[in-house]
């Protein structure tokens, strides 16, 4: 997969993107035939225990992007630019985005609308592919006053349309639409020549993205309305750990099968 192939999928084949934060998850995503792996700053609230994405640092993101690359070396990987890694200056943004490519990302994702058009252009001119992200942009949640659905007012609808066109004009190869009302997401998708990838934005985007922990049911305390739980791995893992605990307590594990003697043959994997 590459940028040009993704762009050609618009209107022909739906794009499938998932988040992944480590090597084993990335390998599974690759083996499942997922088109794009996003190392999201959702790392913060899904893996690192933060309340939201704002505390996530460049250093943390770089570690996880590199891990994902090792797990799926031939996958198309997009790295989220975390809060304040690109907002302070164009020069700093180019430097930080370049760091992601150096550890294995194929592109970066930037939250924000038309006001970031010049920055997107500079990144693209520097050889860094950019995926845009408009609608609900979690890094700006304090400005929005919460996680609110976007595109409900005419003013907001016009802003989103302008932003999508500006990002396309400046060289973005795709745009994530997050929590945008379905009608507006459809209008945006039809108004730009680059793919839109929806999350909570209805049926008419060119692709869909979900968060790893949401679609696999790894968080029993949180289930966003727009997501679908394709498995309940929290319960699967919980039961496995409970069984391991039970067997150890009762002396049922390890057995002879899992033990070595001076007559054992072969290595640890035999």
From Swiss-Prot:
One GO term describing the cellular component: cytoplasm
EC number of this enzyme: 2.1.2.11
Active site: 178
Cofactor info, note text: Binds 1 Mg(2+) ion per subunit.
PANTHER family per record: 3-METHYL-2-OXOBUTANOATE HYDROXYMETHYLTRANSFERASE
Self-association and partners: Homodecamer; pentamer of dimers.
Protein known as: 3-methyl-2-oxobutanoate hydroxymethyltransferase
Gene (UniProt): panB
């Amino acid at each position: 997969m590459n940028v040009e192939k993704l762009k050609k999928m618009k209107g022909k084949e739906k794009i499938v993107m998932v988040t992944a934060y480590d090597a084993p998850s990335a390998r599974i995503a690759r083996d499942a035939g997922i088109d794009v792996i996003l190392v999201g700053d959702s790392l913060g609230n899904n893996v690192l225990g933060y309340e939201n994405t704002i505390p996530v640092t460049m250093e943390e993101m770089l570690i996880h992007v590199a891990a994902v690359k090792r797990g799926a070396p031939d996958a198309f990987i997009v790295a989220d630019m975390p809060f304040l890694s690109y907002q302070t200056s164009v020069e700093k943004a180019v430097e930080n985005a370049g760091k992601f490519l150096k550890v294995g990302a194929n592109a970066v994702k930037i939250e924000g609308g038309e006001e970031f058009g010049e920055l997107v252009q500079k990144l693209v001119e520097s050889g860094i592919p950019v995926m845009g992200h408009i609608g609900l942009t979690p890094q700006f949640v304090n400005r929005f006053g919460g996680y609110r659905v976007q595109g409900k007012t005419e003013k907001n609808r016009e802003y989103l349309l302008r932003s999508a066109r500006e990002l396309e004009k400046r060289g973005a190869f795709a745009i994530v639409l997050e929590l945008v009302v379905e009608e507006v997401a459809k209008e945006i998708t039809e108004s730009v020549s680059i793919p839109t990838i929806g999350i909570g934005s209805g049926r008419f985007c060119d692709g869909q993205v979900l968060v790893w922990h949401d679609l696999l049911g790894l968080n029993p305390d949180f289930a966003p309305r727009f997501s679908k739980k394709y498995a309940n791995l929290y319960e699967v893992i919980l039961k496995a750990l409970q069984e391991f605990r039970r067997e150890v307590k009762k002396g049922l594990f390890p057995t002879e099968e899992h033990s070595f003697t001076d007559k054992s043959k072969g290595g640890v994997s035999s």
